């Protein structure tokens, strides 16, 4: 277990989570000044709106940095553990807070957010996010999910946007999402086929990401 060397990243994870948890009611107060937000019904969808707005915004902001992590790994074989661990802490904390802040969340979303926490903890404490472990495809999966930030933005904005703009936003989001999925799944299959990772670990990981 890599507990001692990752102590500060666990603190990052907790600090990010607390910050996002506090952010929800703060945003709710601000957004209640917007008529279209106030009229969102049922009311629990307002938390759904905030959840996707926060996630879409944060993922959008870290997309350029995620791109450089991926670029450096592919072309220069640079696997920057510090950057990866910080980004992973941020990514996981967003989904953790959603589990507590969003009421009546769909079961599939609950499972997804929960598995993000499991993969984060396992990758950090069991594998130390080391290259050539199961952590590698997990990180790449997260990076491509980051690139698809417009999907989360769309899930929020569809509740308040004009239909005219919503169709354009939906089209762009769909194209980006499909493109990211194609590249991501191609890499996942390629890596899992060629890597020397334990077969049972590969099998469990494959089953989880396909559910």
Q: Can you describe what each PLM-predicted range is?
A:
Residues 151-211:
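C-terminal transmembrane module of eukaryotic multi-pass membrane proteins
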Residues 69, 126-127, 192:
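Hydrophobic alpha-helical segments
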Residues 78-79, 108-112, 136, 167, ...:
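Non-cytosolic membrane-interface motifs at loop->transmembrane helix junctions
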Residues 1-103, 196-211:
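N-terminal signal-anchor/initial transmembrane insertion module
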Residues 100-163:
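Membrane-proximal helix-loop-helix units in multi-pass membrane proteins
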């Amino acid at each position: 277990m890599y507990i001692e060397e990752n102590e500060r990243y666990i603190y990052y994870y907790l600090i990010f989570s607390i910050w996002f948890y506090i952010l929800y009611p703060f945003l709710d107060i601000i957004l209640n000044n917007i008529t279209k937000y106030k009229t969102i019904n049922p009311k629990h969808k307002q938390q759904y709106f905030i959840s996707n707005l926060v996630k879409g915004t944060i993922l959008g902001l870290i997309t350029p940095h995620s791109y450089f992590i991926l670029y450096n790994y592919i072309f220069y074989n640079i696997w920057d553990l510090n950057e990866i661990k910080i980004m992973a802490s941020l990514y996981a904390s967003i989904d953790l807070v959603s589990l507590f802040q969003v009421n009546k969340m769909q079961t599939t979303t609950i499972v997804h957010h929960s598995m993000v926490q499991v993969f984060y903890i396992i990758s950090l404490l069991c594998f130390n996010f080391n290259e050539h472990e199961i952590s590698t495809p997990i990180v790449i999966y997260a990076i491509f999910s980051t690139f698809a930030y417009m999907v989360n933005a769309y899930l929020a904005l569809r509740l308040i946007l004009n239909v005219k703009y919503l169709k354009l936003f939906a089209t762009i989001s769909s194209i980006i999402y499909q493109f990211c999925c194609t590249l991501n799944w191609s890499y996942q299959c390629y890596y899992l086929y060629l890597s020397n990772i334990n077969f049972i670990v590969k099998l469990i990981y494959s089953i989880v990401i396909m559910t």
